[in-house]
């Protein structure tokens, strides 16, 4: 039998990082076994489900390169099928109509609280004759859960997990308005979709026990279950926004590459020996649900940064350039950069990529490191650069300006010879002239090599930027060293 997995998100928000990992595990296992992964949108909560959320989920999957087979399946659109199965269970004596009033249910809950017990429905309509049912109550349908013994969930990750049946009670499968509960709809859909393997978070383990009861009541085969550990923050607590609980779209906007995020997520709860960096082909070849760990994984943003930095360094220059341009419209200040990216600056940006990617962990860092290319003149110096262009720094810069202006050829070799010759004649270390020059050219003390920057910007732009600082910075220091 071919393996069929499913990713079944609720469209009440974005595709969060935990959901992305669940989708990845389902996708990898389907690919590993030559099977299929289906997408089911669990949109029965009509008040909270939105089309925007559905789009965000699908966009997130596409961005991560996680394709699904066939069209997305709407759980809401299958409500009639869910109702039919619930009524069939009643006919088969496996479920029953419950006419308990809201007041009765409130009394059951209150009595349980008073006695220190968990609130459980007491089964009062389990064997009662419905001909005596009150006319003013619309019934729900409840499953006839086993009252003795235990329900065992056979799980490929967690092992056999046992649930005393006395703790599960006769839960509702169809509400009084005819709509199915989540517990019931999931079972019917998994059966009808031919799902063979359910891979999801271990917060669904209790649900698995109740769903097992429904599968057994219908006489259906129970899919193989694999409940994967949740992702915790670096502090070991439940993942919060502060520690990484963001949507996939947020990581895209933060400049992470989909290949890097896949590589990072696959190792949260699963591993293949000491292998840390894996191609997608390796992941498909190696992934198996039997190798998933039981313990919660911890989200480490520094580790993600390191992996993303590796993928950036290994990326094709043109692909990286295109990816950087693509996120400009989504990041702060990106639209202003796009307005200034004329043909010349685009060419300069692309030319700088080989150098920039060596010092960037994200696309946003890469764009920021390239900001000297598209910034407006005169450049605004950051605080560290300002400290270098004091009176002494400006004096050095003035002589550098004159030396560069006289440089016969504007290439790395000629520029190197010109500046190093000047440093030697003045008995200066090269760094003492390179840093003021870097500050004038880029507004910062960190950038690609100063000769690379000079060549990238060209003679006119480089000299103009140096002159800008001689004029503006010198005048701000109340000197007359302007050229």
Curated annotation (Swiss-Prot):
GO cellular component: cytosol
Sequence motif 'HIGH' region, location on chain: 9-19
GO biological process: glutamyl-tRNA aminoacylation
Motif 'KMSKS' region per UniProt: ranges: 238-242
The UniProt record lists the keyword Nucleotide-binding: yes
Keyword Nucleus: no
Top-level division of the source organism's lineage: Bacteria
Residues binding ATP: 241
InterPro entries to which the protein is assigned, alphabetical: aa-tRNA-synth_I_cd-bd (IPR045462), aa-tRNA-synth_I_codon-bd_sub2 (IPR020751), aa-tRNA-synth_I_CS (IPR001412), aa_tRNA-synth_I_cd-bd_sf (IPR008925), Glu-tRNA-ligase_bac/mito (IPR004527), Glu/Gln-tRNA-synth (IPR000924), Glu/Gln-tRNA-synth_Ib_cat-dom (IPR020058), GluQ/Sye (IPR049940)
Location of this chain's protein in the cell: Cytoplasm
EC number of this enzyme: 6.1.1.17
Example GO molecular function: zinc ion binding
Keywords carried by this UniProt record: Aminoacyl-tRNA synthetase, ATP-binding, Cytoplasm, Ligase, Nucleotide-binding, Protein biosynthesis
Catalytic activity line of the entry: tRNA(Glu) + L-glutamate + ATP = L-glutamyl-tRNA(Glu) + AMP + diphosphate
Family note: Belongs to the class-I aminoacyl-tRNA synthetase family. Glutamate--tRNA ligase type 1 subfamily.
Function as written in the Swiss-Prot or TrEMBL entry: Catalyzes the attachment of glutamate to tRNA(Glu) in a two-step reaction: glutamate is first activated by ATP to form Glu-AMP and then transferred to the acceptor end of tRNA(Glu).
Subunit record text: Monomer.
Name the record gives this protein: Glutamate--tRNA ligase 1
